[in-house]
Amino acid sequence: MITVVTVLRTGGGTYTAEWVNRLHAGVQRHLPVDHDFVCLTDDPRGMDRGVCVEPLRHDWPGWWAKQELFTPGLFDDLVIYFDLDTVITGDLVPFTGYTGPRAFLRDFFRYRENMIGSGMMLWMGDEMADIYREFTKDPEAHMRTFRRRSDEFTKRFMGRGHFIQDLWPGLVVSSKAHCRTGLPENARVVCMHGRPRMTELEPKHWLRQRWEAVA
């Protein structure tokens, strides 16, 4: 069974159950194969009925809550992860053929080509469990060392992994790098990163309207 998953750690002031529900609606519309939609969260209130809730077990702040995605035994088979500030704009079926072991985004900005992005990730079963095991040896030390970006910690485990943009050219795009004049042809996933957040865009902005129309 394919699992599509996201993470909602409350307390940051931006993300709420509304973001989970809109992402869920986009996935439901564009993934016409059997799958579960799971949200790891510390507050399940307000989530749509079709969202399977998995409680966050640790009090790791902000983006560090993503490390719980890699908990051994949490998922079987193919896992597709999306950040909450992701807009699903087309058919997701091409991603369902991935057989592992793990795939990350290549950072969208040329000057950081050697960095990964974790706004979308794919992996099989426990293929990412090594990340969790290493992090849980000393979470406080890792959060101090990699305090600017959890992706810097995750990059150490790229190993035999793939870059998503190499596997599916043009299907996953950046709102900042690729969408200034509209949605690129064949784009299936739009990743927003940094500011402006979706809710900070003008109400008439085409991407915000597309995001709001999906639910």
Predicted regions and their residues:
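N-terminal anchoring/stem segment of glycosyltransferases
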Residues: 1-61, 74-75, 194-197, 212-215
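Short, hydrophobic beta-strand segments that form beta-sheet elements in well-ordered domains
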Residues: 33-42, 79-86, 102-105, 163-164, ...
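Short, polar loop motifs at secondary-structure junctions
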Residues: 37-46, 86-93, 151, 168, ...
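GT-A fold catalytic core of metal-dependent nucleotide-sugar glycosyltransferases
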Residues: 45-55, 65-115
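A short, glycine-/small-residue-rich helix N-cap motif at loop->alpha-helix starts
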Residues: 58-65, 149
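Short, well-ordered beta-strand micro-motif
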Residues: 71, 122-124, 191
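Conserved catalytic core of nucleotide-sugar-dependent glycosyltransferases
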Residues: 92-156
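Catalytic core and acceptor-binding pocket of nucleotide-sugar-dependent glycosyltransferases
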Residues: 129-215
